[in-house]
């Protein structure tokens, strides 16, 4: 009997130990994994933040950096490559705000505030944003709608202004600055809108920072009506509460242009082409049943679509 009781006690002890170990080594839940990934991503974002407060574009936010790679990134803190192109800076600020909400790590909060300060400082007095700041050169100094740059920055500032739950750490004074920046940005948008015979149409991907006229960027980004960036601009304007007469006219003019400029009876298809990068190309073919589509660029003088 004594032997049996001893065995039962040993089994009970082993069971308790195994249970404890299994609890410690159990797979993390989906929420825990998500929080861990968010935290790791925020750490990478901290590394890449420039001393100006902004971020460069196209680095890998999910990257797991070696010691050598971390040292290299840290050595580039003074690099003048911070910008708002391709989602840079305004995306990082959102991710840092989320990471701070999950972890209460003040480093994420402080970096987000520094990024917001960067965006406010980067805005021109006329309300526009250059693609790159500080000391923008070449086409990077133009007022940049290309790839959602200016609208991405303005959308973030608008969210900071109204979403106190996501951005509780932003002071009342900074929120007020965000509000003024948005108003100034809207004024700039209206000044940039291209007029033809006195009628409002749409926007170019980039505009002159002094005259507001359409401007060229890269070789294939010519002064033109943009069938892409203009969509994002209109959506932003449509979200304005109680818009003024000028904003309503801007939206109506742009919508009319889109209606007149739609392309019917054609569609874009992907074809194999080993001579092209990725082994494929895109071509336009006739199709009477195709849904309407719009070109990325339209000639300002003729309103004809063109391909570069």
Residue ranges and their predicted role:
Residues 2-12:
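Bacterial N-terminal signal peptides that target proteins for export
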Residues 109, 113-116, 120, 137, ...:
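Eukaryote-skewed repeat-based solenoidal scaffolds used as protein-protein interaction platforms
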Residues 16-24:
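Hydrophobic h-region of N-terminal signal peptides that target proteins for export
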Residues 27-79, 196:
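Low-complexity, Ser/Thr/Pro/Gly-enriched N-terminal "stalk/linker" regions
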Residues 55, 195, 199, 256-308:
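CBM-like carbohydrate-recognition segments
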Residues 29-33, 41, 46, 90-105, ...:
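Well-ordered alpha-helical scaffold segments within catalytic/enzyme domains
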Residues 40-53, 111-128, 179-198, 250-267:
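Long, well-ordered core segments of solenoidal/helical folds
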Residues 30-34, 74-89, 137-150, 216-229, ...:
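Solvent-exposed loop and edge beta-strand segments that line ligand/cofactor-binding
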């Amino acid at each position: 009997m004594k032997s049996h009781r001893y065995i039962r006690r040993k089994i009970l002890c082993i069971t308790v130990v195994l249970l404890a170990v299994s609890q410690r080594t159990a797979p993390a839940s989906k929420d825990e994994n998500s929080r861990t990934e968010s935290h790791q991503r925020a750490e990478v974002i901290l590394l890449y933040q420039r001393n100006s407060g902004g971020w460069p574009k196209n680095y890998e936010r999910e990257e797991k950096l070696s010691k050598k790679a971390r040292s290299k990134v840290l050595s580039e803190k003074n690099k003048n490559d911070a910008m708002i192109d391709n989602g840079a800076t305004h995306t990082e600020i959102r991710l840092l705000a989320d990471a701070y909400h999950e972890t209460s790590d003040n480093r994420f909060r402080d970096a987000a505030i520094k990024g917001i300060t960067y965006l406010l400082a980067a805005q021109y007095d006329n309300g526009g944003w250059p693609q790159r700041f500080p000391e923008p050169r070449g086409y990077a100094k133009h007022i940049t709608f290309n790839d959602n740059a200016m609208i991405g920055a303005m959308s973030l500032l608008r969210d900071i202004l109204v979403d106190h739950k996501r951005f509780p750490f932003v002071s009342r004074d900074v929120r007020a600055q965000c509000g003024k920046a948005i108003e100034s940005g809207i004024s700039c948008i209206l000044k940039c809108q291209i007029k033809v015979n006195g009628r409002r149409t749409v926007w170019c991907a980039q505009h002159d920072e002094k005259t507001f006229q359409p401007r060229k960027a890269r070789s294939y980004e010519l002064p033109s009506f943009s069938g892409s960036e203009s969509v994002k601009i209109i959506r932003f304007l449509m979200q304005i509460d109680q818009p003024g007469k000028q904003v309503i006219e801007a939206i109506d003019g742009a919508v009319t242009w889109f209606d007149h400029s739609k392309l019917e009876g054609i569609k874009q298809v992907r074809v194999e082409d080993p001579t092209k990068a990725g082994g494929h190309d895109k071509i336009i073919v006739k199709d009477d049943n195709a849904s309407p589509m719009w070109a990325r660029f339209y000639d300002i003088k003729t309103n004809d679509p063109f391909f570069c």
